[in-house]
């Protein structure tokens, strides 16, 4: 006898455990008859089919059926004869209405009211280790405990505020009464009263600020303890489910999952360095395109339970990495810093799900850990120091300043770092119009950008910015000390995104000038990035925003040049005051550079430059165009090959000839000569530019011995008009040391 097979798990269906046949003649086990997306148990009267795809034989709940509008009522199955409805049609209508009521009641009981519309998720099937009902029940228990905690917080805040107001009132009355007595005796005047009120106000505000800070720290500590316990309970639910599925191979619809379940540990493993790099997991974020799009779509709507949120986020995930990615992108898109909460916020509302943000007791890292527990992922919160806003190279980490918190999540068999707060980038598009005042208008103008560097960051890169309290959570083979962390160069995420590295592995954040007053920084560039990376720099005093010394720009004491696959910054320190060198970079295409449009540079690293003594006179470089010296930019951006001088510095006599060969058509070469203390107009006759076929020849006749700067400009043969004008673009520059006999 041929037995029917379950459409979900493919195993035989026996009469005692059979659902069906359905309209498409398919059968299910009772345990398999669940929503394909969220895992909600279904009944004959409550299941839905995909009406947009007749080949889709899966079953869905009303909230997740992938129709154009999954919340439309099910069409009444009525038939008409001679324009009249048949009795069967009326029965069908009543049956459809009853089915809709059943679905509404079922979803209300399970707290699955979610925002509409849902994103259209296309994948092979959602596989969840934990039963939906069991996870929802546990979340509701957690929610009640959390409600009690926040009620306690509100009561404590009320009592604390009342006590503060009483103490403040008593203090003011006493101080003002004392002033009144002195005023009556003539030992005080009106001006002194104003000073007294001002001092009392400052004292009151400071006291309130201190009380608020202490209260928030206390509430944050209690909330974190609660969430940690709840995360353990949620992960224990996953552990039990995985163990049950491993013991019973015939259970449910997760045969493929049960085979891989033992690979994920039931308890958090100890911190160990990763056995492979991030590049072994992925090299292009395009692999997460679908996961990211779902997260962005969900973030623009609201959900009422963490269970529904996480199940929808990871519905298309096929690995632990993709689950963590979905949570990371949802948090980085959800702009927690500007969320506005009503005072009468309902705890079971969509915004109530994030009420910890309102109370200041929950942040990116705590929320990330909570969501990871709902996805069955081990996650820890790590505390320590970070080189965050306001930090400058050379600073010491003392007390509570520059304290920070981040996460480590266990995916792909290793602990990996995640920093959701630094990964979030919410930029308002200024082109959309003037600055919007309302939060909703600002939200509409957000461009959802993020920093992928802070997702699964390699430990050898993460240590440049973050130092944990526990050395084991450096995830390094050889952990470093806090002093070593302070001495590491101060870099930003773009440094690693552009594939940069320091050619001197012992380079420190504070660089001491040599006996000649020179300090060198050499940055290596990956071959892939060397053709489109453009660098810039800024030099100012370390302890102020001043950028000039004795009327001269400090930039003129820095020489930037390129050599092979590296960029070199040579600083000729003109003062004993400490300096701050900020190095910028940006990836720019040749086409964009040739337009002459401004380029927005971003900081990649900073250094403190120190010169203990300066018994010499530093001569500033000639006032040339900003940017690197030497012909490498000419070749990189203009295909202009240097034939005679490949270095940035030319040592010559009174006469010098510089030759280039054009590898693509260029037109209208212009060369300008500069020298300190000499008007550029007096040097125009000293330069002659000639183009012969593909050869570009620049002849120089230097009038006096000394140092000169040569700027070379050009444009493409096919002119590009900017505001109706043909602009020349800076091509390269040389530094000439001339000896004239």
Question: Which residues make up each language-model segment?
Answer:
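N-terminal interaction/assembly modules
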Residues: 1-47, 52, 293, 311-313, ...
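Core residues of folded domains in eukaryotic genome-function proteins
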Residues: 2-5, 9, 15-17, 24, ...
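Solvent-exposed, acidic/flexible segments
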Residues: 131, 135, 139-143, 147, ...
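Secondary-structure boundary elements
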Residues: 265-360, 366-375
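Hydrophobic/aromatic-rich core segments of domains that either
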Residues: 364-456
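Catalytic cores of secreted or luminal carbohydrate-active enzymes
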Residues: 437-503
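Beta-strand-enriched, solvent-exposed domains that form extended recognition/catalytic surfaces
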Residues: 505-741
